């Protein structure tokens, strides 16, 4: 699927301005067929780039815990140095969602979001409707979304926090004797990924590590950003020759798991009776069709992530009950269950009095933590019978977390391959086309149903309240 200026995240409703180029964070795998190494073993899940987009090959480690062994700087940096020549100019590209910085940015930001074919997945014959649907949803949702952003100060803090994370990662790499330029590329708002890539080219980077700031892989987050990068790199002769490694997911890294456990353990101590607190993981949801029809590994990785964190807490003597639910569903389709709002009501009614919310999909504070969790879900929980509410902060600039991301960058350097490498591109069918006729039929009638629902007064009202 060829990315266009629209689907690549450029804002068609505002003029381009000069913006500085911040930087971004970590995730595993590649624009080419790349596997990262830890202690001589391949890491994570292998992904290939095809003429039609991303395609999963194999899950190298079914059990995430098999790759969470401790990694020391001495091992990883020495290994990286043995593969990276002294003349290499290293770049690190941190990828993130982006967010409106003012209330006037909200509607065009939402347009960019819903114009992404990885967010609203239409069959190819109907992709000409993408912009129309995106325009409708963004206009309908903008008033309610503006209320949310107004409640947290008038805009998203995501860019500022991501810039700070980029600076911290750069300093951590310098402390490990790795000189690198660190860039930030946002998917749906400034600084767009395209801007960061142009700066990478201008700076003549000769080896690049791409680090999405999403611990778990999803088609709608890391996958969408990689699709844009794939298109940009293939079209540019210079970029096509730059060795690139992508850290596609990193939820199973020991540093990440320990950092999450540290924050949870610390917040539990703020309760009068820490042992009685329900640990409530709230993850960003995705449509069920992504998992069942498109092969998105997000749900599996999220469940493995929670298992790893709880195992670490158990090893520390923290034996609290826990629950996982999914938030932020949009529209009439089925999303991953259970839903956060419904579970909170059930927990309150069942007698849970103390609850600690853990935003497990997010490494930065933004609208879904500051407004959705801290305001909407907190109020709902208290109304439902929960008496003591707490929330674990996003990882942000937690030193152990930043150090681990820097280590992930160092470990991935040897695996970088140029896009022009013929072995780096494998022409295989993606999961959508395994039964193309059936898929198109389903999506055609699904699209008709979606339009009927969207245009009905009841559905219009529902979208205004999302």
Curated annotation (Swiss-Prot):
This is Ferrochelatase-1, chloroplastic/mitochondrial. Disruption phenotype: No visible phenotype, but decreased heme content in roots. Belongs to the ferrochelatase family. Residues 1-23 are annotated as: Disordered. The keyword Nucleotide-binding does not apply. InterPro entries: Ferrochelatase, Ferrochelatase_AS, Ferrochelatase_C, Ferrochelatase_N. Residues 1-35 form a transit peptide. Keywords: Chloroplast, Heme biosynthesis, Iron, Lyase, Membrane, Mitochondrion, Plastid, Porphyrin biosynthesis, Thylakoid, Transit peptide. Residues 1-11 have a biased composition (Polar residues). Pathway: Porphyrin-containing compound metabolism; protoheme biosynthesis; protoheme from protoporphyrin-IX: step 1/1. It is found in: Plastid, Chloroplast membrane; Plastid, Chloroplast thylakoid membrane; Mitochondrion. It catalyses: heme b + 2 H(+) = protoporphyrin IX + Fe(2+). The lineage of its organism: Eukaryota, Viridiplantae, Streptophyta, Embryophyta, Tracheophyta. It comes from Arabidopsis thaliana. Its EC number is 4.98.1.1. Expressed in roots, leaves, stems and flowers. Present in both leaves and roots. Catalyzes the last step of heme biosynthesis by inserting ferrous iron into protoporphyrin IX to produce protoheme. Produces heme for photosynthetic cytochromes, but does not seem to be involved in stress responses. May be involved in wound-induced supply of heme to defensive hemoproteins outside plastids. Regulates the expression of photosynthesis-associated nuclear genes in undeveloped chloroplasts through production of heme. HAMAP family: Ferrochelatase. It is an enzyme of class 4 (lyase).
């Amino acid at each position: 699927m060829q990315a266009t200026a629209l689907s690549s995240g450029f804002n068609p409703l505002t003029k381009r301005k000069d913006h500085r180029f911040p930087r971004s964070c970590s995730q595993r795998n590649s624009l080419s067929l790349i596997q990262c190494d830890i202690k001589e073993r391949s890491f994570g899940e292998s992904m290939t780039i095809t003429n039609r987009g991303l395609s999963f090959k194999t899950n190298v480690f079914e059990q995430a815990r098999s790759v969470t062994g401790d990694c020391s700087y001495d091992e990883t940096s020495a290994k990286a140095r043995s593969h990276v020549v002294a003349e290499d100019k290293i770049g690190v590209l941190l990828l993130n969602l982006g967010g409106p910085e003012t209330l006037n940015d909200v509607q065009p930001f939402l347009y960019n979001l819903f114009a992404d074919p990885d967010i609203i997945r239409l069959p190819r014959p109907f992709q000409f409707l993408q912009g129309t649907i995106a325009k409708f949803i963004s206009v309908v949702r903008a008033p309610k979304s503006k209320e949310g952003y107004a409640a947290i100060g008038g805009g998203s803090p995501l860019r500022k926090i991501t810039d700070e994370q980029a600076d911290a990662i750069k300093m951590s790499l310098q402390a490990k004797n790795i000189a690198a330029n660190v860039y930030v590329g946002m998917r749906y708002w400034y600084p767009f990924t395209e801007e960061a890539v142009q700066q990478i080219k201008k700076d003549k980077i000769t080896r690049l590590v791409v680090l999405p700031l999403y611990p778990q892989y999803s088609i709608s987050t890391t996958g969408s950003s990689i699709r844009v990068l794939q298109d940009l790199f293939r079209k540019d002769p210079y970029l096509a020759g730059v060795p690139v490694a992508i850290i596609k997911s990193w939820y199973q890294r020991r540093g990440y798991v320990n950092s999450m456990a540290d924050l949870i353990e610390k917040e539990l101590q703020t309760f009068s009776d820490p042992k009685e607190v329900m640990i409530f993981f709230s993850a960003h949801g995705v449509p069920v069709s992504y998992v069942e029809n498109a092969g998105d590994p997000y749900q599996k990785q999220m469940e493995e992530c929670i298992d790893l964190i709880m195992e670490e807490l158990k090893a520390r003597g923290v034996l609290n009950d826990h629950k996982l639910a999914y938030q932020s569903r949009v529209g009439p389709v089925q999303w991953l269950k259970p839903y956060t709002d419904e579970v909170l009501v059930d927990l309150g009614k069942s007698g849970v009095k103390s609850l600690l919310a853990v935003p497990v999909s997010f490494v930065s504070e933004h609208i879904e933590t500051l407004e959705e969790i801290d305001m909407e879900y907190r109020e709902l929980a208290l109304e439902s019978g929960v008496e003591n509410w707490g929330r674990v902060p996003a990882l942000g600039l937690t030193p152990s977390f930043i150090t681990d991301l820097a280590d992930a960058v160092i470990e991935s350097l040897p695996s970088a391959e140029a896009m022009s490498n013929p072995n780096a591109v494998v022409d295989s069918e993606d999961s959508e086309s395994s039964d193309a006729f059936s898929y198109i039929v389903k999506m055609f009638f699904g699209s008709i149903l979606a339009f009927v629902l969207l245009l009905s007064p009841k559905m219009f009202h529902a979208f205004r309240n999302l």
